[in-house]
Amino acid sequence: MLAPGESVLIPAEEISLSAGDVISLSVHNLIASVSSYRPWWSEFLAFGSIDRPSSFSPAVSRVKLNLHHFAVNYVLLTAASITLFLIGDPMALVTVASFVAMWLLLYFYRDHPLVLYGRHISDRVIVFGLILGSLWALWFINSLQCLILGVVTSVLLCLVHAIIRNSDDLFVQEKDVVVPSNFLHWS
């Protein structure tokens, strides 16, 4: 029997989801993330907004803003570039695509802990396994040169786009806007 001032903490039951449920939720989170954060391609490829920056300082500010605003588009462009460079080696393409999918589903877009055979798998074990698997895959595919060329090409394309894309007509997120007010300012 408890005294009137005492309380007992009842542990909440942990929700254990199967590996299939975790992956299904991860796929759902991935699709929701890509569809909600990606600016439309018509905005990305707006030819009326392309001009040369006047100096180095505006170019740097354009790069910062465009990299932030078009981040998902640049990731998709990088994936397309890597795919084009690896298309000549289907085994390498399938291997890289499967490891990218594993990283996305098992690490980046997973909300709940992964449970295998009734045991929780920690994030450290998942990251360690994904890193080892990715390094093994890069060694196994023997197409590291094509992969590096794809990444370098996409980085150059993204950088050129970020420099020449005028960022004046981009929509500003409300949370990023700070409106200065002199309401409580005493001079």
UniProtKB/Swiss-Prot annotation:
Record's bilayer topology term: Multi-pass membrane protein
Organs and tissues of expression: Expressed in roots and lateral roots.
Transmembrane regions listed in the UniProt entry: 84-104, 125-145, 146-166
GO CC annotation terms, alphabetical: endoplasmic reticulum; endosome membrane
One Pfam match: PRA1
GO aspect biological process, one term: vesicle-mediated transport
Keywords for this protein: Endosome, Membrane, Transmembrane, Transmembrane helix, Transport
Location in or out of the cell: Endosome membrane
Key word Ligase present: no
PANTHER family (UniProt xref): PRA1 FAMILY PROTEIN G1 (PTHR19317:SF53), PRENYLATED RAB ACCEPTOR 1-RELATED (PTHR19317)
Annotated function: May be involved in both secretory and endocytic intracellular trafficking in the endosomal/prevacuolar compartments.
Similarity annotation: Belongs to the PRA1 family.
Protein's UniProt name: PRA1 family protein G1
Organism: Arabidopsis thaliana (Mouse-ear cress)
Gene (name only): PRA1G1
